[in-house]
Regions:
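Repeat-solenoid scaffold signature
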Residues: 221-244, 275-309
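WD40-repeat beta-propellers
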Residues: 105-109, 152-157, 178, 197-202, ...
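Beta-strand-rich domains and repeat architectures in extracellular enzymes and scaffolds
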Residues: 77-104
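Blade-level signature of beta-propeller repeat domains, shared across WD40, Kelch, NHL, RCC1
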Residues: 399-430
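Inter-blade linker and blade-boundary elements of WD-repeat/beta-propeller domains
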Residues: 4-25, 53-82, 113-131, 160-177, ...
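Loop/turn-rich, solvent-exposed surfaces of beta-rich toroidal or solenoidal domains
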Residues: 307, 329-368
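Loop/turn segments within WD40 beta-propeller blades
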Residues: 90-95, 133-140, 178-186, 225-231, ...
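Conserved strand-to-loop turn within each blade of WD40 beta-propeller repeats
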Residues: 100-102, 145-149, 190-194, 236-239, ...
């Protein structure tokens, strides 16, 4: 079954995924003639039952702060004016935590006492790092970073005392997000302010595909993510349109050709493809620009700058038109539109911060979000748990460690806050 499933298979898939609690029993009778809202959302107005799904884990954040990492950074200045500290990105690989603060990359060993492993600085005092991604290839740990310098830097983590490695050159403007393929670690996806997403074989290095042009992204692409099989990716941004691209046979042939090229062969063997028309697109999901998006199996979780997170299922109707089922809506406190607040999720739980130093945890099983969707009562705070760290701290970045027992928050201070994430035992599942 494809990631974008036909409407005739949508209900069966929802039942297979044990998500029938989202819809009433009468959903079996839904057809194309059923009433739909102006936003192409399936409306369900009958009573909804909420049976428990004991197979999905619930989590909670321990209220006491487990620890803090204080960055060893000097106050940066430009033209005698202090530059605001801004942790733009956090990621980890095994026991190494990567923290991007302005134009510096900090590496910490989080296996024991959070000791500083290394630090590097990007070329140019005013060129900030905006995104990171990590992968291990032939027993070498690589970190790639993008930002205001448009090129993508590839770093050998063992040589972090200086900016070594090479660059992927092709984007014409800022790079906002980087994502490695879930299985083929040669493949790197990048999203940019130049209105394109690009697919690279980062080990050659070679640009394989440009996703852009007519009928494609019309403005800055802020966020991307692969599906769990690496057969599709989703992207969105300033134009508020969600687009899904498929790795079709032509693209796969280009990938296979690049895999046969090594660094000793002459360049130019792989011709860069231009892919314009997406497999799926929809502009009815959010009312504001979308700055974070994630695949969750065949479902998509997306967030807009107005503090609204939606979970939805894309599908093709019987006429081949793009449509979607809205599964959940989560709303968290935000007093202003802030670009770049990221969320993360594990199992059935979503964690996000805001500009007031608050952490929100949403558990889809415990909330009655599905009922709110049915009643169109969207704009409520429906979080399962909220923790206050400190007033007026922008918690823009959130990241789980590899073992999903620690969660890291960072923003507009020189400190990263660490909380312990624990599983909640379901008494009915003993």
């Amino acid at each position: 079954m494809e990631t974008i499933i036909p409407e005739t298979e949508t209900i069966d898939y929802l039942r297979q995924m044990k998500l029938t609690n989202i819809f009433p029993e009468s959903i079996n009778s839904l057809t194309n003639k059923e009433k739909k809202s102006e936003n192409n959302i399936i409306n369900i107005n009958s009573e909804v039952n909420f049976p428990q799904n004991n197979n999905i884990q619930s989590y909670k954040l321990e209220k006491n702060l487990k620890g803090k990492i204080k960055l060893n950074t000097k106050q940066l200045t430009s033209n005698n004016l202090a530059i605001e500290i801004n942790i733009n990105y956090i990621c980890s690989y095994n026991n190494i935590l990567f923290i991007a603060n302005n134009n510096e990359l900090f590496l910490y060993d989080i296996s024991d006492n959070y000791e500083l492993y290394g630090k590097i600085k990007t070329p140019g005092e005013d060129k900030n790092i905006l995104c990171l991604a990590c992968t291990e290839f032939n027993d070498v740990l690589y970190c790639v970073m993008g930002g205001e310098f448009s090129s993508i830097h590839v770093i050998d983590v063992l040589a972090v005392q200086e900016l070594t490695g090479y660059q992927l050159i092709g984007h014409k403007n800022k790079v906002y997000q980087l994502e490695f393929h879930p299985y083929n670690k040669n493949l790197l996806l990048s999203a940019s302010k130049d209105c394109t997403v690009r697919l690279w074989n980062f080990k050659i290095p070679e640009l394989l595909v440009i996703f852009g042009g007519p009928n494609s992204f019309e403005s800055d692409v802020l966020c991307i993510d692969w599906d769990n099989k690496g057969e599709y990716f989703v992207g969105s941004g300033v134009d508020c349109v969600v687009r899904i691209y498929k790795i079709d046979k032509l693209i796969q042939d280009c990938i296979n050709l690049s895999m046969g090229i090594n660094n000793n062969m002459s360049k130019g063997k792989t011709k860069t493809l231009l892919k314009s028309l997406p497999y799926f697109s929809c502009n009815d999901i959010h009312d504001n620009l979308i700055d974070c998006i994630k695949y969750n199996n065949k479902f998509i979780i997306s967030k807009s700058v107005d503090g609204v997170i939606k979970e939805w299922l894309p599908f093709k109707d019987i006429n081949g038109q793009n449509s979607f089922f809205l599964i959940n809506i989560f709303v968290f406190n935000t007093k202003q539109l802030i670009l770049g607040i990221k969320f993360c999720f594990v199992d059935n739980n979503i964690v996000v911060g805001n500009e007031m130093g608050e952490i929100f945890l949403f558990n889809k099983e415990k909330s009655e979000t599905s009922r709110e969707v049915c009643e169109h009562n969207f704009f409520q705070n429906n979080y399962t748990q909220k923790i206050k760290i400190e007033n007026n701290i922008l918690l823009k970045n959130v990241h789980f460690n590899s073992f999903y027992n620690l969660i890291f928050f960072g923003g507009n201070t020189d400190e990263v806050y660490i909380y312990h994430l624990s599983k909640v035992i379901n008494k009915d599942n003993k």
